[in-house]
Amino acid sequence: MAQQTPLYEQHTLCGARMVDFHGWMMPLHYGSQLDEHHAVRTDAGMFDVSHMTIVDLRGSRTREFLRYLLANDVAKLTKTGKALYSGMLNASGGVIDDLIVYYFTEDFFRLVVNSATREKDLSWITQHAEPYAIDITVRDDLSLIAVQGPNAQAKAATLFTEEQRKAVEGMKPFFGVQAGDLFIATTGYTGEAGYEIAMPNEKAADFWRALVESGVKPCGLGARDTLRLEAGMNLYGQEMDEGVSPLAANMGWTIAWEPADRDFIGREALEVQREKGTEQLVGLVMTEKGVLRNELPVRFTDAQGNQLEGVITSGTFSPTLGYSIALARVPAGIGETAIVQIRNREMPVKVTKPVFVRNGKAVA
């Protein structure tokens, strides 16, 4: 039996088409995925992301533990509320999950991890936390709503108290603050400005309704996927998993190699991979008719004349750009063009950086 978030009833009242998403009943769309996508790019949309797992870590050695657990380095976190994106790797350098970590105090950090990987994440964290005497609290008492788009912050702020408005005033991206009963973070998964807001479960339905009344459009998983793909953001299980190195998933920037004496899980394997070279994640653009889909083969000839093949990890029609885009994992050596096999047709594609839209504007 699939679980329901505290907002399930609100979704049905808003006319959602509900689907089972990794054991959670979640809205796919509320009538038009396209309208929802455009609302986020041009105005404000919101997503129920309460299926994500919030984990609070407390203890005097929490920072030391996270410096070992994560490939990125929480030593960078010195300002209260600052957030960091990181991979959590296994010993062979594969990605167990990608997550966000927030710093509150020396003995209090917060993780937000994916829903699909919840059980293995919690097991892995618990196993490795034991020697550090960390107190782990899974915050199933909290709901999480993402409000995204150019007008999202202004519309969400109409629901805030004076204290909450002051707390978020001038807050830069990738920060979070606890203000009253809301935890408000300037994070998201769309390439737009906005907030991800955690609140007690019993407050979620009223907050959702108030957002609807303030002109924020409910959005489902369909729009969430096209938005994150336009923004070049990875989806766990597609761009990376336990068999894929972060170096092959455009996550090299999230690996803190310095200081060289910091030991983190997967470091040794990553150093070998960095030395040998890995596949890479690239963007693909196809302006001709057709749609680039997951798992389609990508073929190209490198500078030495070798014929090589990669694979599309995520592909879709981009509502913002009006043509097809994809992320693809390919061998090193790809040039500016490639061929994608769509049924019996060989379609030419342009190879780009793995990001297509930022703040509503084309970058590919």
From Swiss-Prot:
Subunit structure: The glycine cleavage system is composed of four proteins: P, T, L and H.
Keyword check for Transferase: yes
Keywords: Aminotransferase, Transferase
Transmembrane segments: none
One Gene Ontology molecular-function label: transaminase activity
One Pfam family this sequence matches: GCV_T_C
GO cellular component annotations of the record: cytosol; glycine cleavage complex
Task of the protein: The glycine cleavage system catalyzes the degradation of glycine.
Keyword Glycoprotein among UniProt keywords: no
GO biological process: glycine decarboxylation via glycine cleavage system
Catalytic activity as recorded in UniProt: N(6)-[(R)-S(8)-aminomethyldihydrolipoyl]-L-lysyl-[protein] + (6S)-5,6,7,8-tetrahydrofolate = N(6)-[(R)-dihydrolipoyl]-L-lysyl-[protein] + (6R)-5,10-methylene-5,6,7,8-tetrahydrofolate + NH4(+)
Superkingdom of source: Bacteria
Enzyme class: transferase
Family (UniProt): Belongs to the GcvT family.
The protein, known as: Aminomethyltransferase
Enzyme Commission number(s) of this protein: 2.1.2.10
